[in-house]
UniProtKB/Swiss-Prot annotation:
Its EC number is 2.3.1.234. Binds 1 Fe(2+) ion per subunit. GO terms for biological process: tRNA threonylcarbamoyladenosine modification. One of its GO terms (molecular function) is N(6)-L-threonylcarbamoyladenine synthase activity. This is tRNA N6-adenosine threonylcarbamoyltransferase. Required for the formation of a threonylcarbamoyl group on adenosine at position 37 (t(6)A37) in tRNAs that read codons beginning with adenine. Is involved in the transfer of the threonylcarbamoyl moiety of threonylcarbamoyl-AMP (TC-AMP) to the N6 group of A37, together with TsaE and TsaB. TsaD likely plays a direct catalytic role in this reaction. The gene is tsaD. It comes from Edwardsiella ictaluri (strain 93-146). Keywords: Acyltransferase, Cytoplasm, Iron, Metal-binding, Transferase, tRNA processing.
Amino acid sequence: MRILGIETSCDETGIAIYDDEKGILANQLYSQIKLHADYGGVVPELASRDHVRKTVPLIQAALREADLTPADLDGVAYTAGPGLVGALLVGATVGRSLAFAWGVPAVPVHHMEGHLLAPMLEENPPAFPFVALLVSGGHTQLISVTGIGEYRLLGESIDDAAGEAFDKTAKLLGLDYPGGPVLSRMAQQGVPGRFVFPRPMTDRPGLDLSFSGLKTFAANTIHANGDDAQTRADIARAFEDAVVDTLAIKCRRALDQTGFQRLVMAGGVSANRALRGRLAQMMQQRGGAVFYARPEFCTDNGAMIAYAGMVRLKSGVDADLSISVRPRWPLAELPPVAARS
């Protein structure tokens, strides 16, 4: 089975073709970072217009890369939510239209399920059950996963997502958009322990998280200590250490609560080297294992949508031709898949 995946939920246009026997046959990605850089964040209308310009040419490029024609495809998967409504509608409209024209099913995919299943694209995929840490610019959640579509929310951020906190703190440090990855590189030059940030909500029971206060703490620290290069690096290090420690503490609690021995990291922030190292060390000490996708599949991409769409298509899809998206869409509302395909 070969599935075309279309990802247009935010500011990346991702197109991929996945074969259930051969794996990824094509992967095309266009990032809008330069388009939004002058605004310091994603402008929804600009994002939608750029998806309109890029989606079909990238689909054509993916077919060429895979040396396939539309007749070789068995379905089209597209991100139906959550995300920016205009951006989602571009992918949904193109996906539904092509599927109708080609005579194949169209599969709406949950963006965060795509992220959650991205580690399945690797040579050593995780087995069920596991705890999933979904950590990105828009979401930070801990999920109990006992099968595909069998998701139970354990805890989530009550304010800023971890990735959002990274970007906002980076902006306070004068770093270019998107600042999260730049902050992480700067943190490598920082002196550990010079500044100590709080670990929010770790002094109370439960698995919910909070990161908005770290931004305020960073602003106050910058104001009180100046902004020379080394001080900025030290603040970046203290901020990253606080986020990583907080996530590790909450992951440990989630594993204790569920009794699971496998941890999956997914979403853009799962590419963070410090977080990967900390959680790998923690899981080794526990006698468990941590799983994550290669860095290019941690951020938004079409491959994860194609894979998730394939799984859903094999379980049966609705033949309804209506085009609808869900900017807000709880992961727990997804129906379960009877068996892993």
